Amino acid sequence: MWLLYLLVPALFCRAGGSIPIPQKLFGEVTSPLFPKPYPNNFETTTVITVPTGYRVKLVFQQFDLEPSEGCFYDYVKISADKKSLGRFCGQLGSPLGNPPGKKEFMSQGNKMLLTFHTDFSNEENGTIMFYKGFLAYYQAVDLDECASRSKSGEEDPQPQCQHLCHNYVGGYFCSCRPGYELQEDTHSCQAECSSELYTEASGYISSLEYPRSYPPDLRCNYSIRVERGLTLHLKFLEPFDIDDHQQVHCPYDQLQIYANGKNIGEFCGKQRPPDLDTSSNAVDLLFFTDESGDSRGWKLRYTTEIIKCPQPKTLDEFTIIQNLQPQYQFRDYFIATCKQGYQLIEGNQVLHSFTAVCQDDGTWHRAMPRCKIKDCGQPRNLPNGDFRYTTTMGVNTYKARIQYYCHEPYYKMQTRAGSRESEQGVYTCTAQGIWKNEQKGEKIPRCLPVCGKPVNPVEQRQRIIGGQKAKMGNFPWQVFTNIHGRGGGALLGDRWILTAAHTLYPKEHEAQSNASLDVFLGHTNVEELMKLGNHPIRRVSVHPDYRQDESYNFEGDIALLELENSVTLGPNLLPICLPDNDTFYDLGLMGYVSGFGVMEEKIAHDLRFVRLPVANPQACENWLRGKNRMDVFSQNMFCAGHPSLKQDACQGDSGGVFAVRDPNTDRWVATGIVSWGIGCSRGYGFYTKVLNYVDWIKKEMEEED
């Protein structure tokens, strides 16, 4: 119970009055003038009212009234619910009277009346007595409307919930058992079973009040709806009791069963129906009763069984069904895969996976696929190389093998340390349908240019001035440039040109960034070079130490030109190698300088070359000083030739390289770049020392070579 309190003083009015107390949850009631003596010849009634849904509880804290036999003189009378709860007077311990003590007075409703009455005097044996009166407290107590009130003797006990009663603080409400609906009077219940729905895979269904008598005038519809792919089975339990007639079939009450809209039975009497296999996932039970009868009704248990699909069968020997089961039911599935090196095919479509699901009608939702051998497709073309089949020609399916190779002797396959070229070039069609190499994976090999290996190396020792023309293939790295006039260069790799910085930014010229860069390769004749066409330049890189404005300082006279497109190497177009040690600059070592420069004061139309020895740096330094020249001759340069030889590079040869044959590797190396000198064939020639710039060259080329 909830007990709520509120102190509300209540005073009595004059004789004959009535005092209603406002609806509060608790308060107090006293006699007039309390705790002073109360007046004589006085009567009033106090009406204590609490909110609806509560009862009134009253307890006296102090009580001191004139005692008398039967409380005839002064008294307090308490009444509630049209009944008297007692008449009280005196005080505790007095021989006369009827004091209330600590008794609790409780009303059944939300009202209680307290009547206070005094006579004309308070005398005892001629002595005037003074009595203080009373002090009482009341409180609102929750009324449990759902508790049985017939014990209280009420003529019309309330509430009258037909089924279930629910009490709450200050009130109550009624509800009904399953299968019934609460009516508008909020107390009575009416059977309602016209649209009961069951969707679980199994369960129980029964008539209302089973196994007690079912109500009259029922029109019940119990619908069972389970997922498609399930079939319902019905099993009736004992007792089965539906009102019937000995001569007429089910004239009063009847249970009709429908499966997929078709009637499969109509039942009544006391004989339990047989177990029913409905072969349906939708069943309706219609139960009708008349206005009379006391039969106990019926109850059944329904269960479901899953529909089965046929065993899956493969279409070829390469298909694998994972975890094959002895039986497949609705919603079961199987996964089909292929043996290694084969792939799933559905129609003409390649599948990455295959799953088939058993449908609600007992069929698989998709047909079994086939397995076809993996096809890696045509192998990728290898730039500057090709491939050949080591298995059946033109067959690119699983386990086929090919061998990539490079176009030798101009290209060589890039190999890893410790691996052979043949291993690098072998690719197999894998089970994943890709060509793959054991070391490189899917990445195809790379054919790198072979440097310094001319097919027709030079053998004669002719001079440029008055010398013999170079033959095709003698200097296949030779580049002819026409930028600020004729110049030369050498091919590095298959897309880089090594040349002198001063051919791009000549000394005693203003710096120009928009000069035409014409580059020609692949022939020894200028006219034929022109016919082969110019090679566009993507990028120019000049060494940062080069100073165009310092005419006597050729420090850093080296530059790189990156071609827009790689060139295809052949007998007349091959790169030269870079030096890797100082032995290429040993005194007296012979090298070759080739170019299209001035020949006997005339412009050459054909490539010519000269054979020159590496000179002593100190001799070159002395020779310069003897000529009163202030030119810078640094450690990044070397000199070649001799004043007595009358052989040298000349105008138009600048940018070409000083080529030396390495006897250990039989490769030609660009040890220097034609940089500067004094006239043509008038002494020493000076060259940029390439070895000192190899790191810069490789960085600029980003190791493309």
From Swiss-Prot:
Domain EGF-like residues, every copy: 142-190
Active-site residues annotated for this sequence: 502, 557, 654
Binding locations of Ca(2+) 3: 243, 253, 290, 294
GO biological process, one term: innate immune response
Gene that encodes it: C1R
Effect of residue 50 to D: In EDSPD1; the mutant is not secreted but retained intracellularly; requires 2 nucleotide substitutions
Species whose genome carries this gene: Homo sapiens
Effect on the protein upon substituting residue 73 to A: Abolished association with the C1Q subcomplex
InterPro entries from the UniProt entry: CUB_dom, EGF-like_Ca-bd_dom, EGF-like_dom, EGF_Ca-bd_CS, Pept_S1A_C1r/C1S/mannan-bd, Peptidase_S1_PA, Peptidase_S1_PA_chymotrypsin, Peptidase_S1A
Signal peptide: 1-17
Phenotypic consequence of residue 66 to A: Abolished association with the C1Q subcomplex
Glycan-carrying positions: 125, 221, 514, 581
Pfam families attached to this UniProt entry: CUB, FXa_inhibition, Sushi, Trypsin
Domain notes: The CUB domain 2 shows a compact folded structure in the presence of Ca(2+), whereas it has a flexible, disordered conformation in the absence of Ca(2+). Ca(2+) could provide a switch between the folded and disordered forms; low Ca(2+) could provide flexibility to promote autoprocessing and activation of CIR.
Keywords noted in UniProt: Autocatalytic cleavage, Complement pathway, Disease variant, Disulfide bond, EGF-like domain, Ehlers-Danlos syndrome, Glycoprotein, Hydrolase, Hydroxylation, Immunity, Innate immunity, Phosphoprotein, Protease, Repeat, Secreted, Serine protease, Signal, Sushi
Impact noted for substituting residue 435 to R: In EDSPD1; uncertain significance
Catalysed reactions listed for this entry: Selective cleavage of Lys(or Arg)-|-Ile bond in complement subcomponent C1s to form the active form of C1s (EC 3.4.21.42)
Quaternary structure annotation from Swiss-Prot or TrEMBL: Core component of the complement C1 complex, a calcium-dependent complex composed of 1 molecule of the C1Q subcomplex, 2 molecules of C1R and 2 molecules of C1S. The C1Q subcomplex is composed 18 subunits: 3 chains of C1QA, C1QB, and C1QC trimerize to form 6 collagen-like triple helices connected to six globular ligand-recognition modules. Within the C1 complex, C1R is a dimer of identical chains, each of which is activated by cleavage into two chains, heavy and light, connected by disulfide bonds.
PTM field: Cleaved and activated by autocatalytic processing to generate Complement C1r subcomponent heavy and light chains that are connected by disulfide bonds. The iron and 2-oxoglutarate dependent 3-hydroxylation of aspartate and asparagine is (R) stereospecific within EGF domains.
Name of the protein described by the UniProt record: Complement C1r subcomponent
GO cellular component, one term: extracellular exosome
Site (Cleavage) location in chain: 463-464
